């Protein structure tokens, strides 16, 4: 028995129209994705091209070792006997002292050098590199310790009451707080109230509190992703709650926890406002390990790459010398963040291949 074909719905959209709309939606989504990627590539390419001129050089050893191994200096540009000179602060003082000594020996008045000075446009960024690495490692260590502990409590021990829901809501709201607010919080609590002054420890704690929401949220999701059967099997064998978490849950959640650390590194390393109030100096003569006592290491300020970029960029008017330092510093800064993130990704992938279910 055959049935007559169903009458066509006059209100239904035509197939050709549906296909056109579907293709249009796909094209729009693709263009949006390409636009985001292109914008990021343009920014990175501009920094890489202009920064490479500062970091690399044409002659051996092909790397500007002065820029990577020396502290920042002011640049002095002047003309002497028809020759144009560009010297850093120390070299300029030595050069001027030598000329004055020669003039004094000859019984002549000292020559007058009319030099234009550009702050922090000479020298290097070695103390800034060291300070940035110390700030990232210390703050992420504190953030992972507190964040994973909080995530374990919320995921494994806490119930579903109103207090727990309020805590989760507060954590989500903290993720949207501007970094300048965290900087003022760290300044008021750690620098003033606790008397730590501008120091590594104050910067570590401030940055750790700032990145805690990201670490807690990602770690809690990683813990929840571990199958419940792992917990039940461990408890059935007589293990305690903590033994179950330590042996049957945390190892399998580590890849997700390291993902949160990668996100945290990207944010911590690039923040300027928090460290400007709590940890960073514009210039400092001593390196972090040049201290008299071990405890002085934690209560000293450091120089940092993002703050150095801010200081150099804020010099008005802008000039070619300062711009060279800006892009060179930004290029090195991106490389450091990329290397730290790449190391975290390698560790995460190794753990992911080791702990599978």
Regions of interest found by a model, annotated:
Residues 1-33, 345-357:
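Transmembrane alpha-helical segments of polytopic membrane transport and secretion proteins
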Residues 41, 45-122, 295-296:
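Short membrane-interfacial helix/loop motifs at transmembrane-helix boundaries
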Residues 171-208:
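Generic hydrophobic transmembrane alpha-helix motif, especially the helices
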Residues 139-171, 192, 345-353:
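Transmembrane-helix boundary motif in ABC transporter permease subunits
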Residues 35, 122-153:
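Transmembrane alpha-helix signature in integral membrane proteins
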Residues 71, 275-333:
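Interhelical loop and adjacent transmembrane-helix boundary motif
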Residues 218, 241-281:
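Transmembrane alpha-helices
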